[in-house]
């Protein structure tokens, strides 16, 4: 696509660790020289992977449709350690030696999380309560009642095999789930069922709907001198993506 012809499109970004989803959007705005840019589904700063970014009004109008799609993640759990945010960014609140876990015990636990279920959103999340995100209240120590929401875990599997042993071994899982699913909370709940507690140390989104992170622009592309040219080579047109949504 010629640069002067660009008015709207969809970009797949592989978000690097340590930057917010809004930070990625800000970068894209600067690269494209456009203000009307948004993303379809927040990734926490510690997380990496696929962020669907829409530029131009025809594209941003499609954001809700993209957010409705299924998501796929690869998550690494640290067993035996719990944090207040269920991820590596929060303070440690509990620690327990894991010791030994049979492979069969792990598989049975994961199988129990497959299907439709009710999930209570984490206190440290962007969900709104009286106009403010839940993390606003959590940081002030204000407890807010969080209603459980229905989610569906379509697939969940362990990546790796064998028994786990040691003080705080890692468990790596792949999850394909519905919109609104919190993998941090899923990881914490898995730790509870295993009897040792857990928090996420790594989270990577690999798929969002029919989009795959393998096709995404990288941090190198965003920081390159010819970033605009690289983006134009990888832009997905509103028309082509619209056909996929039909």
Swiss-Prot record:
Catalytic activity: uridine(55) in tRNA = pseudouridine(55) in tRNA
Record flagged with keyword tRNA processing: yes
Keyword Hydrolase (UniProt): no
InterPro entries assigned to the protein according to its UniProt record, in alphabetical order: PsdUridine_synth_cat_dom_sf, PsdUridine_synth_N, tRNA_psdUridine_synth_TruB, TruB_C
Entry-linked Pfam families: TruB_C_2 (PF16198), TruB_N (PF01509)
EC numbers, comma separated: 5.4.99.25
Keyword set, alphabetical order: Isomerase, tRNA processing
GO biological process: mRNA pseudouridine synthesis; tRNA pseudouridine synthesis
Family: Belongs to the pseudouridine synthase TruB family. Type 1 subfamily.
Entry-linked PANTHER family: PSEUDOURIDYLATE SYNTHASE TRUB1, TRNA-PSEUDOURIDINE SYNTHASE
Function: Responsible for synthesis of pseudouridine from uracil-55 in the psi GC loop of transfer RNAs.
The protein's name: tRNA pseudouridine synthase B
């Amino acid at each position: 696509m010629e640069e002067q012809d660009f008015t709207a499109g969809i970009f797949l970004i592989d978000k690097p660790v340590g930057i917010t989803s809004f930070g990625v959007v800000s970068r894209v705005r600067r690269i494209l020289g456009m203000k009307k840019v948004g993303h379809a589904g927040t990734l926490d700063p510690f997380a990496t992977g696929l962020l669907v970014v829409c530029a131009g009004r025809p594209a941003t109008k499609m954001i809700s449709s993209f957010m409705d799609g299924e998501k796929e993640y690869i998550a690494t759990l640290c067993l035996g350690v719990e944090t207040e945010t269920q991820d590596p960014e929060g303070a440690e609140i509990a620690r327990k030696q894991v010791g030994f876990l049979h492979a069969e015990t792990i598989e049975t636990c994961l199988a129990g999380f497959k299907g439709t279920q009710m999930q209570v959103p984490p206190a440290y999340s962007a969900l709104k309560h009286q106009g403010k995100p839940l993390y606003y209240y959590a940081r002030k120590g204000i407890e807010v009642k969080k209603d459980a929401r229905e989610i569906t875990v379509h697939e969940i599997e362990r990546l790796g095999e064998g028994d786990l042993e040691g003080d705080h071994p890692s468990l790596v899982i792949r999850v394909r789930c519905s919109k609104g699913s919190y993998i941090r909370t899923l990881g914490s709940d898995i730790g509870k069922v295993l009897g040792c507690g857990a928090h996420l140390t790594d989270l990577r989104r690999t798929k969002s709907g029919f989009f795959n992170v393998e096709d995404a622009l990288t941090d190198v592309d965003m920081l390159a001198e010819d970033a605009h040219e690289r983006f134009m080579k990888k832009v997905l047109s509103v028309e082509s993506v619209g056909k996929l949504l039909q």
